């Protein structure tokens, strides 16, 4: 039986694409491994699903491609670099085959071409109806893609160049994927896309309607809503708040503000003001008291001044985010900001250190405030020495007691925390589910 390795870099949408490619290849009788646990010599094909968001990640990918080219591996490159930076891919691995983001459904055809001695290239832009595929195999998480592309034109990002304009998938297809995943044993449903906040703008619907419909499906499960661009949130915030009230929906929102300065937001092409963002965040917290809000911040955007940076720091303090993903500005070749004069590296470095320290303090504070409380958590993944789950606010909780299985809902007392997660002690089990074979540890 032919054997393929799929290695994935980047976002949850990329992971969902890899899930789909894995399902397609297994359906064709190909043995598939993910991320690699053995030598590259053990695989007939190596599929690298790439990311183009950060320069550092891109450099790691290019080094990986160079090594595989040198080893003479039969290599397929997919993901955003295959779509946006084909020249860099071929510079590192001239013999590699290319499958762009909208053509991942052709992955089996690409392997067939290669086995017949041809170099495969599937790069025509198409608008597929992608489906979610639940892997199982020790996890209770199903990643369900709901759209591809976006409506925005952010000056720091070239992902739109890779994935194109917004293409929302049919809600019927999405709901069928969720139903199949739940029947297969999934308990956490991750709705993922480049921007879930834009979902449905091309279909006269929105993410709130989709979440509401999904939450009414049969079964015990939790829905995690993916990243929501604040630009779109005001259009449906009331109906989204109603959707959050379902027990089947995590009280969690990922709202990437990127800067606390209106001037920098304008330069970035972000179509909202800080006051508008803060108002929406406060409304969510007011009407859903248990909600946790995560955000992204870019440090060192070329036009960011010292006062602009301080505005970002103060915004973090005022909103009280549960998680802050701090990223140093990364110059991307197809993004408008790449043409701007860059800030001095030492200035950006010191700003990153300051924001990271503040972020860690805020994140730890959001964890310590729930120590001593009871929570019902969904166990989603088993690690080497613990099993971890999520509470209703999507905070990670680790248990060290044996005897529990992925997919169970467990009542715990929060007895402590690390800088990254809560530590729980079981006080009883609720909603025990019938175990299926791939949940066995």
Tell where the protein language model's regions lie, with residue ranges.
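Generic beta-strand/beta-sheet core signal
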Residues: 7, 192-194, 226, 256-258, ...
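Glycine-centered loop/turn positions within well-structured domains
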Residues: 105, 152, 164, 197, ...
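Thr-Gly-centered strand-to-loop micro-motif
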Residues: 8, 324, 399-400
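Hydrophobic, well-ordered secondary-structure elements that form the walls
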Residues: 255, 296, 316, 324, ...
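Proteins enriched for Cys/Gly/acidic motifs involved in redox and nucleic-acid/cofactor modification
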Residues: 1-198, 253, 275-286, 310-318, ...
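Conserved SAM/AdoMet-binding glycine-rich loop
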Residues: 75-79, 84-85, 183-306, 317
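Terminal RNA-binding accessory module
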Residues: 331, 338-441
């Amino acid at each position: 039986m032919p054997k393929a390795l799929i290695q994935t870099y980047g976002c949850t949408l990329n992971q969902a694409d890899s899930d789909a490619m894995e399902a397609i290849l297994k359906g064709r009788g190909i043995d598939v491994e993910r991320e690699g646990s053995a030598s590259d010599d053990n695989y007939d094909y190596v599929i690298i699903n790439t990311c183009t968001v950060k320069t550092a990640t891109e450099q790691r990918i290019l080094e990986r491609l160079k090594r595989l080219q040198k080893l003479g591996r039969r290599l397929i490159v997919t993901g955003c670099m295959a779509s946006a930076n084909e020249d860099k891919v071929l510079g590192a691995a001239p013999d590699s085959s290319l499958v762009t983001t909208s053509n991942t459904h052709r992955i089996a055809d690409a392997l067939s071409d290669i086995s017949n001695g041809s170099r495969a290239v599937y790069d025509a832009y198409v608008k597929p109806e992608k489906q979610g595929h639940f892997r199982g195999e020790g996890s209770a998480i199903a990643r369900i893609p709901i759209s591809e592309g976006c409506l925005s034109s952010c000056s720091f990002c070239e992902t739109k160049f890779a994935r194109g304009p917004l293409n929302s998938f049919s809600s019927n297809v999405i709901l069928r994927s969720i139903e199949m995943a739940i029947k297969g044993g999934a308990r956490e449903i991750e709705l993922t896309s480049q921007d879930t906040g834009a979902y449905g703008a091309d279909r006269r619907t929105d993410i709130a309607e989709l979440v509401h419909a999904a939450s009414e499906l049969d079964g015990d499960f939790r829905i995690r809503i993916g990243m929501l661009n604040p630009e779109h949130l005001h259009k449906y915030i009331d109906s989204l708040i109603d959707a959050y009230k379902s027990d089947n929906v995590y009280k969690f929102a990922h709202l990437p503000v990127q800067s606390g300065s209106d001037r920098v937001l304008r330069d970035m092409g972000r179509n909202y003001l800080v006051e508008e963002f803060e108002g929406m965040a406060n409304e969510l917290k007011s009407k859903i008291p248990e909600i946790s809000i995560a955000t992204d911040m870019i440090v060192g955007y070329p036009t960011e001044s010292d006062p602009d940076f301080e505005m970002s720091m103060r915004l973090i303090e005022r909103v009280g985010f549960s998680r802050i993903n701090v990223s140093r500005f990364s110059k991307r070749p197809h993004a408008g900001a790449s043409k701007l004069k860059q800030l001095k590296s030492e200035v950006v470095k010191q700003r990153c250190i300051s924001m990271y320290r503040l972020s860690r303090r805020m994140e730890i504070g959001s964890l310590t405030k729930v120590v001593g409380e009871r929570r019902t958590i969904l166990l989603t993944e088993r690690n080497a020495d613990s099993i971890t789950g999520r509470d209703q606010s999507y905070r990670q909780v680790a248990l060290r007691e044996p005897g529990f299985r992925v997919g169970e809902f467990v009542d715990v007392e929060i007895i402590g925390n690390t800088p990254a997660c809560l530590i729980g002690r079981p006080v009883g089990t609720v909603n025990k589910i019938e175990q299926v074979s791939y949940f066995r540890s």
